[in-house]
Design a protein with these regions (language model features):
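A short beta-strand motif characteristic of beta-propeller blades
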Residues: 4-10, 41-48, 85-91, 133-140, ...
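Non-cytosolic head/periplasmic domains of membrane-anchored proteins
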Residues: 5-115
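Repeated scaffold domains used in trafficking and secretory/extracellular systems
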Residues: 11-22, 51-60, 94-103, 141-154, ...
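Hydrophobic beta-strand positions that form the internal "hydrophobic ladder"
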Residues: 25, 63-65, 106-109, 156-157, ...
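Residue-level marker for isolated small/hydroxyl-bearing positions within beta-strands
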Residues: 28, 66-68, 111-112, 159-161, ...
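Structural motif
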Residues: 33-37, 72-78, 117-127, 163-169, ...
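Solenoidal tandem-repeat scaffolds enriched in leucines and small polar residues
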Residues: 73-166
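Hydrophilic extracytoplasmic domains
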Residues: 205, 210-304
């Protein structure tokens, strides 16, 4: 098999954040003042901010959210529609924005913030409806720092941190996964909102639990992984797990469909239908997702 490069777009960002969704990519310079929105083949828009960028996200319909250091506030959130017009803005007086996500219909934003009070850190998550100035929902998580917010189907929201795995439905009903014995180590959310979560069993670096959920937040299956997990990825049909020596792929019932030996320098895996790609420092290797055959593979080096 061969892998064909679709496009190559240069940037000079020193700390790039890349956020892809439904064929569009938001590339932001974290700590800088510029961002780009791109299709598979070209740059659609390049914007600048007055203050330093700290986080960013893009929704399925092209709505983009940029979080920056604040102007007369601790941090600011600005939301643009697909025509690059500002449709919502919010000033966070006392806290730093950590993570953002946009709902599929482009009408809601979820924001994780971190602040300090009496010398103690605290974290909370807010849900904004762009029809209103203030948050329509708010959830406090105490000292558990929330590193990820992801909208699933409709307004169903996944909230994650090292010791947090919560699903919010109807903007108010929060359901918490019990992580008293385990901690969250890896998470992947597909374009169609399937969730794959890797937990460290009893905090172990080598004993893992793979939990997979559908876009309604319902658990599909659980599998034990007896190796350290470097990366996990899922699409609408398969879930792939990268360890130090293997790439293991499962179907949506938890059945193993393929297992490949990989080199130890793999950094991340990415499932995309027929192939699962493994990124390393020098190359990208493609493996058959549904077969153990080593004949149906491809490699792209950094200079190709």
């Amino acid at each position: 098999s061969t892998a064909r490069k679709v496009s190559e777009i240069q940037h000079t960002y020193s700390s790039p954040l890349c956020y892809g969704n439904s064929g569009r990519v938001l590339l932001a310079d974290i700590g800088g003042n510029t961002f780009k929105i791109m299709s598979k083949t070209k740059t659609l828009y390049e914007g600048t901010t007055d203050k330093k960028i700290i986080s960013a996200a893009i929704g399925k319909n092209g709505t983009a959210a940029i979080a920056t250091r604040g102007t007369n506030s601790q941090s600011d959130l600005t939301v643009y529609n697909k025509n690059q017009r500002v449709i919502f803005s919010w000033k966070c007086a006392k806290e730093n924005i950590v993570a953002i996500d946009i709902s599929d219909n482009g009408k809601l934003a979820a924001v994780s913030v971190v602040g300090a009070e009496n010398g103690e850190l605290y974290s909370r998550v807010l849900i904004f409806d762009f029809s209103y100035e203030e948050a329509v929902s708010e959830f406090d998580f105490g000292s558990d720092i929330i590193s990820g917010v992801n909208f699933l189907k409709g307004d169903t929201l996944l909230i994650t941190g090292e010791n947090v795995f919560s699903i919010v439905k109807n903007k108010t009903d929060k359901q918490d996964e019990d992580l008293s014995l385990n901690s969250l180590s890896r998470i992947s959310v597909s374009d169609n909102n399937v969730v794959a979560a890797v937990l460290s069993k009893y905090g172990s670096s080598s004993a893992k639990i793979l939990n997979v959920y559908n876009r309604n937040g319902e658990k599909l299956f659980t599998v034990d992984i007896s190796s350290a997990v470097k990366s996990v990825s899922c699409d609408n049909q398969r879930v792939s797990v990268l360890t130090d020596s293997e790439l293991i792929c499962f179907d949506m019932k938890g059945n193993e469909v393929s297992r490949h030996s990989v080199e130890s320098d793999g950094i991340r895996c990415f499932s995309d239908g027929t192939y699962t790609y493994v990124y390393s420092t020098s190359k990208i290797s493609a493996y058959s997702t549904n077969s153990n055959s080593e004949d149906d593979t491809a490699t792209v080096t950094n200079d190709s």
